[in-house]
Amino acid sequence: EPFAGSAAITIHAAYHGLANHFVIGDTLRPLVELHETIIEKPATISDAYERIWSAQPEGAKAIDYFLKIREQYNRERDSERLLFLILRCVANAVRFAKNGNFSQSPDKRRRGTHPDRIRESVFAVSKLLKGKTEFCCADFATVSESASHDDLVYMDPPYQGTTDGADKRYFEQLDRERLIIRLREMTTRGVPYILSYDGQHGEKKYGEDLPADLHAYKMLVRVGRSTQGTLNGKEVITYESIYLSHGLRAPKEEPQFSFALM
């Protein structure tokens, strides 16, 4: 999973016994280190989160506390504060600036996930993935270059709408042509992949389709209400474009389901 993010697909695959070895990769080092700490040292990260969460003051001062933790993280780049920021930011809509700084604001309506629940989730993930996972802080091309025909590469890169437009929400943007070149190389090597790339919000479509010569199967999957739309006070249904590499069996019926990550 070279654009790991929350590593939800890795966790899903491990939970359902779909693979016995995993690679979690991302260009944002603190995020990769957070995954590694969760999996390899679940007690350490759980204790740290509980300490940071419990130190929150009540009322309006909680906002200042969040901003203080965010400032400390942006200076230290530590996984403990990063976990708190992810779970405490508005609508869990995680945003990083181009320089790697955490840039999202605090959610004023809640205090973040309770430490007991986080501890339970962290230990469950550790049990699934400990001893089975490699961690790689590198570009997606580097992470995926060792994949073979016996592997499955799942990619959820920044969408064209957040790379080419004015709305830059991610630490590292992605050049579409570089992605297509890598997909062609993977197709030539017989490496199967699933790509979540662009889609549409309501009636508005984002991004161009992949080139026809890739012979990838495209389907639209309903993933629920748009987080960005919710932040803007609008209810907009989001559909993601999912591409299956040539050779992967497409479902008989295109799935229509909703899911939530962390």
Describe the predicted segments one by one:
Residues S121-E134, R182-Y193:
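A structural motif corresponding to the C-terminal end of an alpha-helix
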Residues T27, L128-F140, L174:
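Adenosine-cofactor binding site in Rossmann-like domains, unifying the SAM/SAH pocket
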Residues K132-T133, D151, A216:
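Short, conserved active-site loop motifs that form the nucleotide-linked donor/cofactor pocket
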Residues E1-A13, I24-L28, L83-F96, A138-F140, ...:
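Conserved proline-anchored active-site loop of SAM-dependent methyltransferases
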Residues A97-K98, F102-R111, P158-R178:
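Mobile active-site "lid"/loop adjacent to the S-adenosyl-L-methionine
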Residues Q173-M262:
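Long, positively charged, glycine-interspersed low-complexity recognition regions
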Residues Y15-K130, G247:
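Class I S-adenosyl-L-methionine-dependent methyltransferase module
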